[in-house]
């Protein structure tokens, strides 16, 4: 960025502080302006005095916004002053604070970026330009525009991460003053804040911004729920604070007895949106949310963190499965702390966090606690390259974003992988791998290396053979077993969650099976449009234009992309409609195809014979049985094995360890028949760990009965001071039903863990 000589350089009135009467300045800014005035009076150059950049930026913004008012009626300058103050509180450098004052100047006045650069330097101008561009993005627009706006935002962040921090401060103050807008605008801005900016603040570790953005969004999106929860929190505050003070007194004595002299005990109230999220996602009442109030212990060293943890577990009984060590395994945003949940007073669960002062600073201020440019004085240190470790998530987004042609899929993957929490698993050598929550061994394999994923045969998780679609949990040790003649399955696309794995699987099918993919693409398009006139449509000029609009050179490439899942048939049909194609006539046959207002849905043809009614497709007329080692369910990837004897085909889950023992020529591809009306059930073994109390088994069985799940067998094992182990054999129709009932049981307040038991 270079200054343009032809543009006039505006004048900065250095005496502006003496003329301010319409707003009350914060004390820090008053002190800064007074010091700057003294330096000028003592003969220093106004452009080189120690406080010049911040003060000159304020005076410049004050003059430009002097005649402007916000919707609330207050002077407009109050907003830039508030934004600059938020950035100062985060520890931002002078360029950031100056950008806070100037961030609306280019958009709302006649001043150009070149003039900003001439007055305040390239670094400040670059930040102002970045924020100005972000302000023009509409994240609630059409999917294609939304995807492009996301891409531009991440590129701006990669160039200088401070741009998005200034934007977050701008958004936070706008949310604080949202009352002056119409209800419709309030909801639109609140939705965008909740979906985009609060998760970004979380990824950057700026907890102070994150919780307030979430609570303010909640206030405008769900006003009735917000007021109700706010009232309940206030109503119970006295009891909570009394219990916390008693707990503090108990711990204060024991910590000193342990030799930990310097520490701080803080109450940590749960924020309103966090309470609402738990109530809705876990189907719990307000009274069942045990961590509405929590305790934080701040000590001086990492060693004292673990000593303090020992004290806590001596004083209060820890609840098994509720301990997390984020010191040994930090979050991607560099958050570190020990989390434990104990049975506190009156046997109510109490969450306790333990961290050092430095860890606490990082937890509150996030990336602001790590900015290296403050030490070196160079802006280039704020870029992505020098802080790779802290921004692996952003680097991954930049790596794969250009590979996805389908805008809708890009936005969905983005929201899942940027805004969801991560899960941390280990390689057999102890290396930590961070994956999106819900990731499977297939996602893990492709994270290790593309070829590991391509030749994956199965996976051992914690030493046990599990299905390749198993959802990984924190702390799992994952080992991928490969075989030279193994290759990806299209079924993997149904359960992988990371964009990199999804893209590499599709690339493999794109390269290796082009003819099959074209045929499959035709079939998918035929389902959307109907068979009549399809040939004419595929040869038409509008179809060629549609292929080009979808970034393919020709229709065959588009069909291949459909076949291996790079783009969806729904997206293709939508592009056709955008081209205003209503009918395409076949000149030879006079047949026509019509693009309906919505995609055609063809109901499945009822099976004509008993053979067609088989749950398994691909072995019609053959004897088969469901393998007892792995108990596959409809909806799970399966493989057939030709048995030695008269038992016919044995149906196994893909990834079953018994498949490893089989000769390759005995394996045959099979799949579940989606058209069957055979509603049989299949046995599934699950193990539940629950708090040992009277009636816990009854409550679990009632939950199963309410969902029409038959229980074949139940067994309970208890040991004093340990959770109850409940083993159940239940009848399940398909994999989706299993996932649904497991989620409902996990949400029960007494349930600590639940897993499916598979021997194969």
Swiss-Prot record:
Supply one GO molecular-function term. guanosine-3',5'-bis(diphosphate) 3'-diphosphatase activity
- Which pathway does the database say it acts in? Purine metabolism; ppGpp biosynthesis; ppGpp from GDP: step 1/1
Give every HD domain span: 76-175
Q: Which residue ranges does the record annotate as region Disordered?
A: 585-614
What sections of the sequence does the record tag as coiled-coil? none
Keywords linked to the UniProt accession: Hydrolase, Manganese
Enzymatic reactions: guanosine 3',5'-bis(diphosphate) + H2O = GDP + diphosphate + H(+)
What EC number(s) has UniProt assigned to this enzyme? 3.1.7.2
Domain of life (superkingdom): Bacteria
Respond yes or no to whether keyword NAD is given for this record: no
Please report a single Pfam family linked to this protein: TGS
Give the enzyme's main class according to its UniProt record, as a single word. Answer: hydrolase
User: For this UniProt entry, which segments traverse the membrane?
Assistant: none
In its UniProt entry, what is this protein called? Answer: Probable guanosine-3',5'-bis(diphosphate) 3'-pyrophosphohydrolase
Organism listed in the record: Synechocystis sp. (strain ATCC 27184 / PCC 6803 / Kazusa)
Instruction: Give the encoding gene's name.
Output: spoT
